[in-house]
Each structure stands twice: as C-alpha cells, then as structure tokens.
C-alpha cells in the first residue's frame, strides 16, 4: 500500500504526511521548488521531516514557473503583512491575490500524479484546508473532486487525490498534528516551515507575513505549545 504526499514543508502538508504514515502507507514525499523565495527553507524542512519519519523524499525543480512572474512569492514584489485580527477580513483576500502563483496546484498535482502512477501508489495526500479554501480556489474540495475526475482519464492506475484536512481549520490541524506526533512517537511540527520568506536560517520564521500569522493563531487557539522560532 503506497502513497505520495505533496510535502511543502509547511504545517498542513506535514500533518497530512503524518496521517498517511499513521494509516500504514509506504510514503514517498514530493517537494516542489518553483522558484519561491523560501524554497531552500521549505526543502530543508521537508527533508528533516522525512528523515524523522523514515520516508523517501523527492525534490522536483520547476524553474519555468518563475516565467509566470506576477506572484510576490516568485518575484521581488512586496509580500503583504496582516495582523491576526485581519486574517478573516477582505484584506486577506487581497493578500491571497498578491501571493497567488498561476496554476501552481494544477502543475504540482499533475506531476505528483505521474510519480504516483510510476511508483504504483494509489493515493496522493495533499494539505488543502478549510481556512485557506476561503481565499484560495485551488484549496477546496471542489477542486480536488474535479482533479480526480481528470485522473480517471489521465492515469491507468486511477490514482486518487485525498484531502483529509479539507474541512478543518488550522487550529484543528495543529491539534490533530500534536495527537499524531504523540501516537507515532515523533516530533515534526516544530520543523515545519510556513513563512513566505527565507530568513537566512532553517526553521526561522519572520512572524509577520500572513502565513506566519495563521500559524501563530492556530497554535494559540489549539492550546498547543508553539515551538516555532520567530523573528517577531
């Protein structure tokens, strides 16, 4: 029983990888380098997590994505910051548009599907969630269902994408992650990387970007100790 996880090194994909591991799958994690600012830190976080969990790790380079320009994640455009109380406001939608990378999930999930078919994996686990689904249309269960329809025709082994966190908030994801860490006897959440920036040191977060603020709020609301290193 084999599975692929799309592991960005972030909180959600780390918990999804824990879920796949807990379900007994032989897991291969894939991390994508598409020229994002934090690529080095994300890859190093994913590598550390895979080492702890004893799973195979594949890094796929997608240099052409930078040609899309536009997104603050792959250009020198300023990345917006948000206060915690603004995370559920209209301003969060504007921030989403600033960091949106054209067709990113379409590209990554398509490539992950190719690896899944080649490795005889039946499932691809991804970390889309309720909170980000509000602003990112490719973080919704509707997107997953539509993509799975494509995979019925695009793969011979009918590989299927699983999104076990699609209806969960970040708070619930942190709680679940902490429970799975305890169950599996591992500690990986503190090595996950959510920040949009490369802050010059592995696992070090800026503490100001939208992604960092969502991470901070999640741990705070979950009542789980946040062992993340923040600059602010």
Swiss-Prot record:
Its EC number is 6.3.4.20. Transmembrane segments: none annotated. Binds 1 zinc ion per subunit. Pathway: Purine metabolism; 7-cyano-7-deazaguanine biosynthesis. GO terms for molecular function: ATP binding; ligase activity, forming carbon-nitrogen bonds; zinc ion binding. ATP binds at residues 7-17. Pfam families: QueC. Keywords: ATP-binding, Ligase, Metal-binding, Nucleotide-binding, Zinc. It catalyses: 7-carboxy-7-deazaguanine + NH4(+) + ATP = 7-cyano-7-deazaguanine + ADP + phosphate + H2O + H(+). Catalyzes the ATP-dependent conversion of 7-carboxy-7-deazaguanine (CDG) to 7-cyano-7-deazaguanine (preQ(0)). Belongs to the QueC family. This is 7-cyano-7-deazaguanine synthase.
């Amino acid at each position: 029983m084999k599975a692929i996880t799309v592991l960005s090194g972030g909180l959600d994909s780390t918990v999804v990888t824990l879920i796949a591991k807990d379900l007994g799958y032989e897991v291969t994690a894939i991390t994508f380098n598409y020229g994002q600012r934090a690529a080095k830190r994300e890859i190093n976080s994913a590598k550390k997590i895979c080492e702890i969990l004893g799973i195979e790790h594949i890094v796929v380079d997608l240099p052409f994505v930078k040609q899309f320009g536009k997104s603050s994640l792959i250009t020198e455009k300023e990345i917006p910051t948000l206060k915690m109380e603004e995370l559920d406001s209209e301003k969060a939608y504007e921030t989403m548009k600033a960091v949106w990378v054209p067709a990113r999930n379409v590209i990554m999930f398509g490539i992950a599907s190719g690896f899944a078919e080649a490795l005889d994996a039946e499932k691809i686990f991804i970390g889309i969630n309720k909170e980000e689904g509000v602003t990112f249309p490719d973080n919704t269960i509707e997107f997953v269902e539509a993509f799975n329809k494509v995979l019925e025709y695009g793969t011979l082994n009918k590989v299927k994408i699983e999104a076990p966190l699609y209806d969960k908030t970040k708070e619930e994801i942190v709680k679940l992650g902490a429970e799975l860490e305890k169950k599996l006897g591992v500690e990986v959440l503190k090595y996950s990387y959510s920040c949009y920036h490369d802050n010059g040191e592995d696992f070090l977060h800026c503490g100001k970007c939208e992604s960092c603020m969502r991470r901070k709020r999640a741990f705070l609301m979950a009542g789980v100790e946040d062992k993340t290193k923040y600059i602010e």
